């Protein structure tokens, strides 16, 4: 059971109602994360704004999901693991074996570049972005740029907002996402 109210369009603070309507229209349901964030309309606005910016960063859609899933796993957020697994499998059509490797933080054997991204993301989180020159160089040697490195930090910051909000609230996973938990 959630430690925070999970708002609907009807119960949300006035400042969050339009955002919830937009999410409902876009997804066909309101993810419980959004209902939780509606308790703080500025947190919900931040999520939507930063999410939009993250969606147009220098990483590909697949690479952004690697960052999001890796962060969710490291931060212990089952809700976000499920949500981003659904995106990876259903929207991006990634192979289940690849998604399972990302979720397990194991080596991504079939794609060295994505593996370098996952390792970099993991290291950014665990070392609070205090990477050695060799750790950074391994990322660049895989074909990534300094812009990509900063966009990983952007993705991790978005994930941290979501993961921590879900962990704080003990957000239950929506039925629409249960299959991907």
Language model regions located:
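Hydrophobic alpha-helical segments
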Residues: 1-181
């Amino acid at each position: 059971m959630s430690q925070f109210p999970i708002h609907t369009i009807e119960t949300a603070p006035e400042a969050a109602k339009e955002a919830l309507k937009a999410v409902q229209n876009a997804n066909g349901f309101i993810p419980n994360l959004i209902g939780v964030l509606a308790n703080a309309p500025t947190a919900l606005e931040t999520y939507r704004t930063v999410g939009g910016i993250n969606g147009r960063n220098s990483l590909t859609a697949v690479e952004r999901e690697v960052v999001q899933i890796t962060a969710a796993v490291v931060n212990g957020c089952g809700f976000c693991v499920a949500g981003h697994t659904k995106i990876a499998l259903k929207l991006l059509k990634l192979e289940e074996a690849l998604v399972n490797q990302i979720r397990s933080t194991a080596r991504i054997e079939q794609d060295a570049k994505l593996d370098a991204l996952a390792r970099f993301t993991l290291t950014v989180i665990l070392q609070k972005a205090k990477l050695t020159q060799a750790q950074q160089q391994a990322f660049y040697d895989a074909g990534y740029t300094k812009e990509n490195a900063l966009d990983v930090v952007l993705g991790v910051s978005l994930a941290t907002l979501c993961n921590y909000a879900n962990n704080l609230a003990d957000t239950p996973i929506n039925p629409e996402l249960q299959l991907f938990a």
